[in-house]
Every structure is written in structure tokens, then in C-alpha cells.
């Protein structure tokens, strides 16, 4: 077909067709921009909702941490206040027995043998209570000197003992659950 066979548009028709094409393109671009805008707005709203939820979760977590910290501080405070309660209740009978021993010793015509036996039993009760709470005595007589557990007060010549051996204990030492509370004060052989 030749160019002459195609229907010719008048310049007015051509201009109208051009305007229609431009309007159609604008309408389609407006609708695509509107759809894109709607998608962006929806995405922004979703992100804002997520942000709000994250902030609320962070606030709840901070409040929970504050409560946990407060409860832990209260537990530590109670442990400091009442941690020795069982120990004290075990020591009270010892104190009572010592009081009775003093009364018996002060009584007129007191039998010192009975007082001595009473004090010995009280000491045994005290040592049993201490042991029950993890306190052990360090009485190293005859053992090699250990500077981690013993404090040498003096060193003397002793032909009957090996050098660096504890030959006398001035004061017994104590450990609490294996940790030294007080070293034993000792005399060591040279």
C-alpha cells in the first residue's frame, strides 16, 4: 500500500491525536505515581507502626531490667541482714551454756570439776557449730611450716624436730570453707 492509500489526517485531527496521546500518557503516569505514592505511604505507616512497637518493647524491657535489678538488690540486702541467722541460732545455746558455767563457778562451794566439764562440753558444742558452718581449726603442731596457713612467731633450735617444723602453737588458726580467716601463730624449729 502506498502513502497515498493511508487516510490523511488533517492538521487539527493530528493535533487532537497528539493531545489525546499526551493526556493518556499523563493519566497513566498519574495513576502509576498515585499507586507508587499509596505504596510508599503504606510502607511508611507500616514502618512507623514497627517503630512504635519497638519503642514499647524497649520500654518494657527497660522496666523489666529495673525490676530485676531492684529485686536482686533486695535479695542481697536480705542476705546481708539475715545470712547469719542460722549461725546465730546455733551460737545461742553456746552462749547460754557459758552463762550457766559462770553462774556455777560463782556459786559458793562450787565443784570445779563440774564447772570444767561444763565448759569443756560448751567448747565442744561451739566447735561443732562452727564446723557445721564451714569453719575448721588449723592446729599444725608437728606439721611442716606452711606460710599460707601459719604465722611464725619465733624459730628455735630443737634437735628432736626436723627443721622448719611447727613445734608449738600459740594460737590456733581458722579457715572458712577453705579460705584462711586467721593464721595459726606458731613456733618453728630451725
Swiss-Prot record:
Q: Which GO terms describe its cellular component?
A: cytosol
GO BP, one example?
protein folding
Q: Which residues form a coiled coil?
A: none
Q: Does the keyword Cytoplasm apply?
A: yes
| Keyword match Transcription | no
What subcellular compartments does it reside in? Cytoplasm
Location of the region described as Disordered in the Swiss-Prot/TrEMBL record: 1-36
Official protein name in the record: Protein GrpE
Question: In the record, what lineage is assigned to the organism producing the protein?
Answer: Bacteria, Pseudomonadati, Pseudomonadota, Gammaproteobacteria, Cellvibrionales
Name of the coding gene:
grpE
Amino acid at each position: 500500500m502506498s502513502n497515498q492509500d493511508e487516510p490523511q489526517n488533517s492538521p487539527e485531527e493530528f493535533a487532537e491525536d497528539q493531545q489525546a496521546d499526551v493526556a493518556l500518557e499523563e493519566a497513566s503516569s498519574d495513576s502509576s505515581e498515585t499507586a507508587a505514592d499509596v505504596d510508599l505511604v503504606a510502607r511508611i505507616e507500616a514502618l512507623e507502626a514497627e517503630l512504635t512497637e519497638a519503642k514499647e518493647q524497649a520500654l518494657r524491657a527497660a522496666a523489666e531490667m529495673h525490676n530485676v535489678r531492684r529485686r536482686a538488690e533486695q535479695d542481697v540486702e536480705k542476705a546481708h541482714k539475715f545470712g547469719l541467722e542460722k549461725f546465730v541460732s546455733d551460737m545461742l545455746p553456746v552462749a547460754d551454756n557459758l552463762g550457766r558455767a559462770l553462774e556455777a563457778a560463782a556459786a559458793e562451794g562450787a565443784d570445779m570439776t563440774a564447772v570444767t566439764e561444763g565448759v569443756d562440753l560448751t567448747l565442744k558444742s561451739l566447735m561443732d557449730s562452727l564446723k557445721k558452718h564451714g569453719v575448721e581449726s588449723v592446729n599444725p603442731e608437728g606439721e611442716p611450716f606452711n606460710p599460707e596457713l601459719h604465722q611464725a612467731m619465733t624459730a628455735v633450735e630443737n634437735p628432736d624436730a626436723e627443721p622448719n617444723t611447727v613445734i608449738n602453737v600459740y594460737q590456733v588458726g581458722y579457715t572458712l570453707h577453705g579460705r584462711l580467716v586467721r593464721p595459726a601463730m606458731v613456733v618453728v624449729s630451725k
